A protein has these predicted regions:
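PRPP-associated nucleotide enzymes
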Residues: 1-381
Length: 381
């Protein structure tokens, strides 16, 4: 199992227009705000799964937290060495069925929800449950989620719970409000709780800007993984296997155009694992000269040029899921080809988002763009 130090997983950035918390811990290996080798990102996420399996064997249900931990939790679950069910929270409205809501109190977008149609019977049958986030500071979001699940799914009170994260800043008595629950804690890195407001105040920042001019033309393709949506719940490793099986034929068909090229694979908001797996398969096949992955996000982060500051460039984009919502992409690098992988159901929002994103990619020095949408969300007219 790979080991990591806090210097491997933590960079400090300034939030924009967030009165709850002025700073953000940015993980350079997570594949969200900073381009990263897909293999390196999945190795780090897998290390958390290996640690979970070692310290808390028997987990057969994993719950991940949107937006930034959707891939973290799934990749960790897949590396635990046993089949399990996986579901992640979402900020997107549900299409049908019952769900429960809770608050992520320090976030720019505080409302989170869990869909219950599959989750409730999974909780009833589970031997042990893990709740996985990328970073835990106060633990309030996790407390809110566990309390909400306790009300909606009372059987969870009889299950051993493990709260896992890449980075934990929880203290010795992390969740006194849940003292009567059976809860354990696992993390890759532990760092004492500290307020970094003054530490980030020295950085000169400006907000991300809207791209200018016309975007690049782009080709479209389909990733055929019908019927699998982690917002509703999926099985692992089946979901990971399906993503790999769907990616390989696409990559083989693109092989001649990828040889020696610099390729950036981009996910969209909560949709991160499909792009990470696609990028990792491309990386492993050896077609491309360089593969990097990161994703769009709802998080408004300051852009700065001070030495050591992690967010060096940023663009405002319309969301792939709601054209009236603002999202962002940070640290785009020059590349020969950008491949955007999304599970958006909204054709109009996807078109609007691609207009903005391709304009940002053009400004960053990208040569060509390909959009790949998951098959279940393509409307056949």
């Amino acid at each position: 199992m790979n080991t990591y130090l806090d210097g491997d997983l933590i960079r400090l950035a300034r939030r924009v227009h967030n009165t709850r918390r002025a700073y953000l811990l940015v993980n350079p290996l997570q594949g969200k705000h900073i381009p990263v080798s897909p293999g390196a990102a999945l190795s780090m996420m897998g290390a958390l799964g290996e640690k979970l399996a070692l310290e808390q064997p028997g987990i057969d249900l994993v719950i991940g937290f949107a937006e930034t931990a959707t891939a973290v939790a799934a990749a960790a679950a897949a590396r635990m060495g046993r089949p399990c069910h996986y579901i992640h929270t979402t900020r997107e409205p549900g299409t049908s069925g019952e769900s429960v809501e809770f608050r992520e109190e320090h976030s720019h977008a505080v409302e989170q929800r869990l869909r219950l149609s599959r989750l409730r019977p999974w909780i009833d049958r589970a031997r042990a449950i893990a709740l996985v986030d990328d970073e835990l500071s106060t633990g309030r979001t996790m407390v809110n989620a566990i309390r909400t699940l306790g009300e909606a799914c009372p059987s969870i009170r009889q299950k051993p719970l493990t709260v896992a994260s890449l980075v934990s800043r929880l203290g010795p008595d992390p969740m006194p409000a849940l003292a009567d629950w059976d809860i354990r804690f696992v993390s890759l890195v532990h760092r004492p709780m500290e307020d970094y407001t003054s530490a980030v105040s020295r950085y000169a920042i400006e907000p991300a800007r809207s791209p200018e001019g016309k975007g690049l033309d782009y080709d479209e393709g389909v990733l055929p993984i019908s019927g699998m949506d982690a917002r509703d719940g999926v099985g692992l490793p089946e979901w990971l296997d399906a993503l790999a099986a769907a990616s390989d034929p696409l990559l083989e068909g693109m092989a001649d155009g990828l040889r020696g090229k610099r390729v950036t694979v981009l996910g969209t908001e909560e949709c991160m694992l499909p792009g990470l797996v696609f990028g990792q398969r491309l990386e492993a096949m050896g077609y491309a000269g360089r593969v990097r992955f990161h994703a769009t996000t709802r998080s408004p982060i300051g852009v700065g040029r001070d030495e050591g500051y992690p967010i060096r460039a940023g663009w405002r984009l319309r969301s792939f899921y709601d054209a009236g919502r603002v999202t962002y992409i940070y640290n785009l690098e020059a590349c020969d080809l950008a491949i955007v992988i999304t599970d958006s159901r909204d054709d109009a929002a996807t078109k609007a988002a691609m207009e903005d994103l391709t304009a940002a990619l053009r400004e960053a020095g990208c040569g060509a763009v390909r959009l790949i949408r998951e098959e279940r969300h393509v409307q056949h007219l």
